[in-house]
Structures are given as structure tokens and as C-alpha cells.
């Protein structure tokens, strides 16, 4: 099987809703105002604990506090559909979301204040089933109960349609069980409400589910089906995965559905702060990885991707100072 060559990806190897978002935004605003007299305070809006992005935000917050002298608050929200406009409005200083979610949010809501910091790491994902079942491929999901809807992560449905398309399936071919976000979908899976859930590799929740149900399996995606998938979502690709503690559920070398995870801010954040954020995470990668193994894929060059969202001037200066050119999609 020929997978896209990803030298950076090998670094991964290791030896409801709206109301909740607004409440979180209010709490964050109070925190930021109370800290105005302090040195520097940043709020990082992310998803709920147990998600890949929450762990990533926690790692970044720790490094920024310990290495860059910044006071940082990690602010969980219901999902990426909340995080992006929250950050654009300046109610959070930094946000983390996948590239598709960012593209759609900007296209639909005209978030003119949103500014990109960079692509922090690839986002490898999968449909997971119980290891005790005979289900092994995406085609086996036909007629099964599968998480769907994702009202707080609206673009996940687009990704799921792309993955189903690799085996000639559509959402109509599965029994859809509506959930607000991936964490709730995993909880429903544990409770027996669905046959398959969708999540990113490296998230603590995946490890938790694996231990709770006695083992899970990542469903295989046929490379031949990627042409059909790209008609749904052009930026998705298969990246190599092998059995190891990061890729829980991978039983043999296979390709896993992947795209980029982005770090972004807004136009009101000072240039020197954004510059300091990038400089700190690049220089202290080893510290980040102790908390979030997915950040093994982080590189200064990898941050600077081509995207429809404009870069923050602080990021532009960092890339210019370090002679880092822009690259195309992975």
C-alpha cells in the first residue's frame, strides 16, 4: 500500500452546547479582566477534557507559563464550532481546531478578526469498534449504529461522509445516533448505545475507552477509496500508522485518515505575544511531548502552511526572521 510520504509524521512514534460555550466565554472574560494588572495573561479555548485538543492546549499552556513567563488559562468549551468565533471575537486569545472547521467557520460567518498562528500537528483519526466484534473495515459499518450529527463540531459530519465514501457508503447506509461532540460519542459507545465511535488518535479518551471495554479496533480504510473521499473533503489524506501506544486500536500497519490541526488567534493580540508563543513552543518541543505525544510532529517549518485565513503579523515576523517559507497542503 502506498501512503503519502510524511517524514514529519514518523515523529508520532513513541517507545447543550451554545450555552455552555457562552458560559465558558463569560468565565474566561472575567479571568482575563482580573488578570489585566498581571504580567501577561492568555486564554486558550479548547475542547473538553479527554479530547486530543484539550491535552494539546494543556501542554502549550504549561510551556508558555514555565518557559515564556506568560500566565495561561485553559478554557474548555463544547466544541470547535464554539472555539473559533469565541477566539475571533477576542473572548479567548488563542484557539485550537481542525483546518476544515476553521475554513467552514470563516466562510459561513465572515470572521474577519481571526488570524492564523500555524499548523501545530497532523490530526490522525479513525472509526473505532470493540475488539471483540468481527468489524474490521469501513465497509463493515453498513447497517450499524454509528455516531453522527456533532452539533458542536459541525464539520465532523463532512469528514465522516468522506471516510464512509472510501467504501461506497453514505450516512443513509448506517443507523445514525446523534451526538453533540466526539467525547459524548465515545461515552455512548462505552454505554452500548453505538457500534462505532469516531475520535482522534492520541486523545486520553481513546485510551480510557480501550481500557473500559476490553480493547478497541481502528477500522481500516481502503486506499483505493481515497479518490471518492477527496470529492467530499479535498484536504484529507491517509498517513501511516503502526501498532504502538499512540495508535491505540491499530493492529497492523495501515493508513489512517488525517488532516491538519491549527492554532489561531485574533487581530487584537499583540504581535510580540504571538511571536513569543511560537518561539516558546518551537524551542521547548521536548517539554510539550511529555504531555502531548502528538506534538512530536511539531516543527517550525511545519507551522507555515497555505491557508485561506491570514496569518497574524507576529507569526509573519517569526517566519520571516527564521526564513521559513510557506508550504502547500500536506
Question: PLM ranges: what are they?
Answer:
Residues 98-101, 108-109, 133, 170-177, ...:
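Pocket-lining segment of extracytoplasmic ligand-binding domains
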Residues 1-16:
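N-terminal secretory signal peptides that target proteins for export/translocation
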Residues 40-67, 72-73, 123-191, 285, ...:
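Bilobed "Venus flytrap"/periplasmic-binding protein-like clamshell domains
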Residues 33-39:
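Sec/Tat signal peptide C-region and signal peptidase I cleavage site
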Residues 88, 92-122, 204-207:
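Acidic, polar ligand-binding/catalytic clefts
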Residues 151-162, 237-307:
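Ligand-binding clefts/hinges and TM-proximal coupling segments of bilobed small-molecule sensing domains
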Residues 69, 79-82, 89, 112, ...:
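Extracytoplasmic
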Residues 183-184, 191-192, 200-218, 223, ...:
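An extracytoplasmic/periplasmic, membrane-proximal ligand-sensing/linker region
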Amino acid at each position: 500500500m502506498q501512503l503519502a510520504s510524511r517524514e514529519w509524521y514518523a515523529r508520532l512514534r513513541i517507545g447543550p452546547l451554545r450555552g455552555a460555550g457562552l458560559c465558558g466565554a463569560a468565565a474566561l472574560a472575567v479571568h482575563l479582566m482580573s488578570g489585566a494588572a498581571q504580567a501577561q495573561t492568555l486564554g486558550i479555548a479548547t475542547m473538553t477534557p479527554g479530547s486530543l485538543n484539550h491535552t494539546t492546549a494543556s501542554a502549550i499552556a504549561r510551556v508558555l507559563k514555565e518557559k515564556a513567563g506568560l500566565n495561561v488559562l485553559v478554557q474548555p468549551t463544547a466544541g470547535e464550532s464554539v472555539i473559533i468565533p469565541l477566539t475571533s471575537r477576542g473572548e479567548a486569545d488563542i484557539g485550537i481546531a481542525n483546518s476544515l472547521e476553521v475554513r467552514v467557520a470563516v466562510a459561513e460567518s465572515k470572521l474577519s478578526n481571526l488570524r492564523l498562528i500555524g499548523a501545530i500537528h497532523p490530526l490522525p483519526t479513525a472509526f473505532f469498534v470493540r475488539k471483540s466484534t468481527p468489524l474490521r473495515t469501513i465497509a463493515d459499518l453498513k447497517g450499524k449504529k454509528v455516531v453522527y450529527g456533532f452539533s458542536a463540531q459541525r464539520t465532523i459530519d463532512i469528514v465522516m461522509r468522506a471516510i464512509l465514501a472510501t467504501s461506497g457508503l453514505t450516512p443513509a447506509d448506517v443507523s445514525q445516533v446523534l451526538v453533540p461532540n466526539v467525547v459524548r460519542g465515545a461515552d455512548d459507545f462505552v454505554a452500548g448505545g453505538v457500534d462505532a465511535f469516531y475520535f482522534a488518535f492520541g486523545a486520553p479518551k481513546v485510551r480510557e475507552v480501550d481500557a473500559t471495554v476490553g480493547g478497541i479496533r481502528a477500522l481500516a480504510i481502503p486506499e483505493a477509496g481515497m479518490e471518492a473521499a477527496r470529492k467530499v473533503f479535498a484536504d484529507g489524506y491517509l498517513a501511516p500508522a503502526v501498532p504502538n501506544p499512540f495508535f491505540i486500536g491499530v493492529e497492523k500497519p495501515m493508513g489512517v485518515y488525517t488532516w491538519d490541526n491549527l492554532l489561531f488567534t485574533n487581530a487584537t493580540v499583540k504581535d510580540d505575544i504571538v511571536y513569543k508563543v511560537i518561539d516558546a513552543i518551537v524551542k521547548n518541543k521536548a517539554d510539550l511531548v511529555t504531555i502531548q505525544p502528538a506534538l512530536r510532529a511539531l516543527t517550525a517549518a511545519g507551522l507555515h502552511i497555505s491557508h485561506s485565513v491570514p496569518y497574524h503579523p507576529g507569526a509573519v515576523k517569526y517566519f520571516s526572521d527564521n526564513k521559513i517559507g510557506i508550504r502547500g497542503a500536506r
